């Protein structure tokens, strides 16, 4: 009995079963821990996990980010790196968590929370953030995401928040954290301000009023300024009209009224008018006008025209209505003239009792306000328009721009530093650096940090009644200034800590705010390691080498990490960042629970398995959106994973028969071996280059091409070497090439398909406990033969053209044909032609010249393209073309252009029709210029040979079904019509040799299997 050196496998084993088997293997053998130990103290590579919140289920988009992260880390392990900071992370604070809690309790506003109790509310928030942590951990295991979950950083922990306190104290002491009363984006539903990067994530394209309003000039009857606004609800708070000092304005008369507006807008608003005078905007400055609505007080210095450069000619009339209570630019004008701010809107976004529309939400009052303007002859024109407007990115409420006391981080002061540090970052894709991300940095706004909410990192600022402020940077600082350290630093416990003012000795109470949760995640670079309190933080840990998340994090985590690191360390937070786009449903729609198209990560993995899912994520660039495509995922499995299972099975079955065991790669002598090893090593170079540059999708494409060439070219053309004869030197070199190529391919795939690669690696009698402990393949340069690769590429194209042409002619591959003609500019060496000849399966294969091609070619000019060049000579050219069609064709094919009496015409100016002559079918490859012609005539001799080949194929299938070893002899019984009998008799020896049949008998046996061969029924039985 021969020893089984390589385990025979079930090639139909499901990918799910493979995943589960390998997951158990890793756990039982502590592979993850062993990799960490074996790579300790090697070249450091720091990773930082973008922290999700575990109060929601992981979806298929999360799988993609985890696939990218894990692929990069596995690759770095295999290329000799010690991965630092490979811990998970959990984002625990903020509005998303609070809104879920409010929904659970049925709360409508902040008053409900305070009546319920901050302590109980926050306790629910704390408990809820880990609601789905078990599912997250299961998904991470199933997808193969190797991170240290036990030591994950968690933003709600005291150590983490203490590091943030240190950072905020540092910013405060450097005058970068300041309190100011100014206009901020404000969510009336959540009752808190938002930062500019949060606002950027919530824009919607909506229909809003477009209103042209008449403001009466003071002391001048029937003279008005026409101002434009999309927020009529702000008109009761109007205090100024703003013009651009350098633009041209006109005073015109129409229908007995006079109007001021931008000169360039007159024609669009008036059909019939008389120009009175033109002005520069600065000439209008200081003109007073009547208060538009007499419901609010009349502040001193208000109701006048002022000039400012922010006014543009793009929309409206060039005259902007300014309400300092509701716009940042307006607010600055109000400050310039020291006016009292008119704010009739409460923090729920409703008008107060000073206006007739008391109790209405501001935008709900728009129609009533427009009606008021119409009734009082103050409305010039009212329309609607579509434009982008910000909504709360968490609850979906329309944001207001509202005046509040807010703590700001002065990001605007470090814009130059942000841009300089951005230059140090490798962005993938690179256009984000100076595009979406760089543009955002150029306009970086001061960060509205404080939130008038409950569940978050408390702002570490205390204030006494004399308005002295104190920033706390650690728990010890609480003791230093006369307080105590609560067990939990969250609200409400921290609110009870009273300190002693170091300036005046009076009591200090904490500013009641929490901070923007984006500061939490943006602090992960240092706070995850409890810097500066922990001594574990080193230069190797910062900046981190690699991060990746979805594209929207250019306005989120990527941005806040960058800002915080630039503020605190004058450094970029990360060196390499891969931005990932979204996974869409099968119809290209964004997935959500409300639409019913949400795909849970665990369901996706249970349907397809981790390796097929991971390969699917890399079918295109990760930064391009992709739709879930069941057919594509099935093709990925069949073309790559199933193919490799079959390649391994072929190797193992034959190697076990021949008792072959791989020891080392042998120098290739056979042309196919040389080509296969050249392709392998060329691929290794390309794959490493792309993996090093985070282009995983491109690396995978090269691997997929190699798998196809290994199976469909090398094995297909080499089968007989494995089936025939004893284990001689040539056969041993074939085994060596096949084993080595298969093993190195599996190792290349390992970071992308970790389970599948481990499965096949273990079957190949490995040298390491895990494929992931192997070194990543390195190219053996001496095996690379570029000329041979180029020639074989053309040979493969010829085989593909033959396959396509046969398909179109309905001639099977096993049916020999009379003649194949090939036209190609590249001459193939004879030994390559000999190799591909059996695949072409023709009695005669001839390489021909262009004028020998059985084609009728007509070339005609595309008049739309040549007329301008030929002009009056176009008739002469058409006559020339008619007489010299073949010559023109050859010139265009060889040179890409022709010269007609000094006029150069290129091949894209012509239309070429090719009609095949006689009994030929043909195909061509546009890229290489190869033409292939097949003679479609099949005479009786060819037909019989084709039948014989079909019989051989059926017997081989039956041998495989019986699990016969390749050396086992059989006896074959056949029953068929005269044509098939004639074919068997003529090719008896060939059939015997190729099927290992010791005897072939014509006999009708009731146990015979029926086969269909070209509409003929053939009965075959084989016995050992």
Curated annotation (Swiss-Prot):
Motif ('KMSKS' region) on chain: 590-594
Top-level taxonomic group: Archaea
Catalytic class of the enzyme: ligase
Cited SUPFAM superfamilies: Anticodon-binding domain of a subclass of class I aminoacyl-tRNA synthetases, Nucleotidylyl transferase, ValRS/IleRS/LeuRS editing domain
Database matches in InterPro entries: aa-tRNA-synth_I_CS, aa-tRNA-synth_Ia, Anticodon_Ile_ABEc, Ile-tRNA-ligase, Ile-tRNA-ligase_type2, M/V/L/I-tRNA-synth_anticd-bd, Rossmann-like_a/b/a_fold, tRNAsynth_Ia_anticodon-bd
Name of one Pfam family that matches: tRNA-synt_1
GO MF entries: aminoacyl-tRNA deacylase activity; ATP binding; isoleucine-tRNA ligase activity; tRNA binding; zinc ion binding
GO cellular component: cytoplasm
Keywords noted in UniProt: Aminoacyl-tRNA synthetase, ATP-binding, Cytoplasm, Ligase, Metal-binding, Nucleotide-binding, Protein biosynthesis, Zinc
Cofactor(s) the record lists: Zn(2+)
Compartment annotation: Cytoplasm
Chain positions of motif 'HIGH' region: 52-62
BP terms from Gene Ontology: isoleucyl-tRNA aminoacylation
Gene3D superfamilies: HUPs, Isoleucyl-tRNA Synthetase, Domain 1, Valyl/Leucyl/Isoleucyl-tRNA synthetase, editing domain
Enzyme Commission no: 6.1.1.5
Catalytic activity: tRNA(Ile) + L-isoleucine + ATP = L-isoleucyl-tRNA(Ile) + AMP + diphosphate
Major subcellular location class: cytoplasm
Disulphide bridges, residue numbers: none
Binding site for ATP: 593
Free-text comment about domains: IleRS has two distinct active sites: one for aminoacylation and one for editing. The misactivated valine is translocated from the active site to the editing site, which sterically excludes the correctly activated isoleucine. The single editing site contains two valyl binding pockets, one specific for each substrate (Val-AMP or Val-tRNA(Ile)).
Family indicated by similarity: Belongs to the class-I aminoacyl-tRNA synthetase family. IleS type 2 subfamily.
Function: Catalyzes the attachment of isoleucine to tRNA(Ile). As IleRS can inadvertently accommodate and process structurally similar amino acids such as valine, to avoid such errors it has two additional distinct tRNA(Ile)-dependent editing activities. One activity is designated as 'pretransfer' editing and involves the hydrolysis of activated Val-AMP. The other activity is designated 'posttransfer' editing and involves deacylation of mischarged Val-tRNA(Ile).
Self-association state and partner proteins as the record states: Monomer.
Protein name: Isoleucine--tRNA ligase
Lineage: Archaea, Methanobacteriati, Thermoplasmatota, Thermoplasmata, Thermoplasmatales
């Amino acid at each position: 009995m021969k020893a089984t050196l390589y385990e025979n496998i079930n090639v139909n084993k499901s990918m799910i079963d493979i995943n589960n088997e390998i997951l158990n293997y890793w756990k039982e053998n502590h592979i993850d821990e062993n990799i960490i130990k074996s790579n300790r103290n090697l070249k450091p590579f720091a990773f930082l996990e973008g922290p999700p919140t575990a109060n929601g289920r992981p979806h298929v988009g999360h799988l993609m980010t985890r696939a990218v992260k894990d692929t990069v880390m596995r690759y770095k392990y295999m290329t000799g790196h010690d991965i630092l900071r490979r811990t998970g992370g959990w984002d625990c604070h903020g509005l998303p968590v609070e809104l879920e809690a409010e929904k659970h309790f049925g709360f409508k506003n902040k008053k409900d929370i305070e009546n319920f109790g901050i302590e109980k509310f926050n306790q629910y928030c704390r408990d809820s953030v880990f609601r789905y942590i078990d599912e997250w951990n299961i998904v991470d295991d199933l997808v193969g995401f190797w991170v240290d979950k036990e030591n994950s950083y968690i933003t709600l922990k005291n150590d983490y928040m203490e590091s943030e306190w240190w950072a905020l104290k540092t910013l405060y002491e450097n005058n970068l954290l300041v309190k100011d009363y100014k206009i901020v984006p404000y969510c009336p539903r959540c009752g808190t301000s938002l930062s500019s990067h949060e606002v950027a994530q919530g824009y919607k394209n909506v229909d809003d009023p477009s209103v042209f309003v008449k403001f009466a000039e003071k002391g001048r009857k029937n003279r008005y300024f026409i101002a434009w606004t999309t927020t009529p609800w702000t008109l009761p708070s109007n205090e100024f009209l703003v013009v651009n000092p350098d633009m041209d304005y006109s005073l015109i008369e129409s229908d007995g009224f006079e109007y001021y507006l931008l000169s360039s807008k007159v024609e669009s608003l008036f059909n019939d008018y008389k120009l009175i005078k033109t002005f520069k905007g600065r000439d209008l400055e200081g003109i007073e006008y009547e208060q538009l609505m007499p419901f609010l007080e009349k502040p001193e210095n208000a109701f006048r025209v002022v000039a400012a450069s922010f006014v543009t000619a793009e929309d409206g009339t060039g005259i902007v209505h300014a309400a300092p209570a509701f716009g940042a630019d307006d607010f600055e004008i109000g400050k310039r003239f020291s006016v009292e701010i008119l704010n009739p809107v409460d923090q729920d976004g409703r008008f107060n009792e000073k206006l007739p529309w008391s109790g209405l939400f501001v935008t709900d009052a728009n129609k009533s306000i427009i009606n008021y303007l119409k009734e009082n002859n103050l409305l010039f024109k009212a329309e609607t328009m579509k434009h982008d407007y910000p909504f709360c990115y968490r609850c979906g409420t329309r944001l207001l721009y509202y005046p509040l006391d807010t703590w700001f981080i002065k990001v605007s002061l470090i814009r130059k530093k942000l841009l300089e540090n951005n230059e140090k970052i490798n962005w993938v894709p690179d256009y984000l650096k100076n595009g979406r991300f760089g543009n955002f940095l150029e306009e970086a706004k001061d960060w509205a940090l404080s939130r008038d909410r409950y569940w978050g990192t408390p702002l570490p600022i205390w204030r006494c009644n004399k308005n002295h402020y104190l920033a706390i940077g650690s728990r010890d600082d609480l003791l230093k200034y006369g307080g105590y350290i609560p067990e939990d630093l969250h609200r409400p416990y921290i609110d009870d800590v009273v300190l002693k003012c170091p300036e005046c000795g009076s009591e200090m109470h904490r500013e009641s705010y929490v901070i923007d949760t984006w500061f939490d995640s943006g602090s992960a670079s240092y706070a995850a390691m409890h810097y500066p309190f922990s001594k574990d933080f080193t230069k190797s840990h910062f900046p981190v080498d690699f991060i990746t998340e979805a594209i929207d994090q250019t306005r989120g985590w990527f941005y806040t990490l960058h800002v915080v690191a630039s503020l605190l360390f004058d450094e970029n937070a990360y060196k390499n960042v891969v931005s990932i786009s979204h996974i869409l449903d099968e119809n290209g729609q964004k997935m959500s629970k409300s639409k019913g198209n949400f795909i849970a990560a665990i369901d996706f993995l249970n349907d397809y398995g981790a390796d097929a899912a991971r390969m699917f994520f890399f079918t295109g660039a990760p930064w391009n959106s992709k739709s879930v495509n069941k057919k594509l995922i099935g093709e990925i499995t069949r073309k790559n994973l199933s193919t490799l299972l079959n390649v391994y099975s072929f190797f193992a079955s034959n190697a076990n028969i021949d008792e072959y065991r791989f020891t080392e790669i042998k120098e290739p002598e056979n042309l196919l071996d040389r080509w296969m090893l050249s392709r392998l090593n060329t691929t290794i170079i390309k794959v490493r280059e792309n993996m090093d540059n985070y282009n995983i999708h491109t690396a995978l494409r090269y691997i997929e091409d190699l798998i196809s060439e290994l199976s469909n070219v090398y094995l297909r053309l080499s089968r007989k070497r494995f089936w025939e004869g004893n284990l001689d030197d040539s056969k041993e070199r074939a085994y060596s090439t096949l084993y080595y190529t298969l093993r190195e391919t599996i190792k290349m795939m390992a970071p992308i398909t970790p389970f599948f690669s481990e499965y096949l690696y273990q079957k190949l009698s490995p040298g390491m406990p895990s494929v992931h402990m192997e070194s990543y393949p390195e190219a053996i340069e001496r095996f690379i033969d570029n000329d041979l690769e180029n020639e074989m590429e053309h040979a493969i194209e010829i085989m593909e053209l033959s396959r396509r042409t046969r398909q179109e002619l309905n001639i099977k591959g096993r049916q020999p044909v009379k003649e194949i003609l090939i036209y190609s500019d590249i001459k193939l060496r004879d030994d390559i032609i000999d190799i591909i000849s059996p695949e072409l399966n023709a009695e005669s294969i001839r390489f021909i010249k262009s004028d020998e091609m059985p084609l009728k070619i007509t070339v005609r000019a595309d008049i739309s393209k040549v007329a301008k060049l030929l002009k009056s000579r176009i008739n002469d050219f058409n006559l020339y073309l008619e007489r010299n069609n073949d010559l023109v064709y050859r010139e265009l094919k060889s040179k890409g252009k022709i010269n007609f009496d000094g006029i150069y015409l290129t091949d894209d100016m012509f239309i070429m029709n090719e009609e095949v002559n006689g009994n030929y079918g043909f195909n061509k490859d546009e890229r290489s210029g190869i033409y292939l012609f097949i003679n479609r005539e099949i005479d009786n001799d060819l037909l019989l040979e084709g039948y014989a080949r079909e019989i051989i194929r059926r017997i081989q299938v039956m041998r495989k079904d019986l699990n016969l070893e390749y050396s086992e002899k059989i006896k074959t019984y056949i029953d068929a019509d005269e044509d098939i009998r004639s074919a068997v008799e003529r090719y008896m020896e060939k059939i015997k040799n190729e099927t290992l049949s010791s005897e072939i008998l014509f006999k009708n046996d009731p146990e015979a299997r029926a086969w269909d061969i070209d509409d003929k029924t053939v009965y075959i039985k084989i016995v050992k």
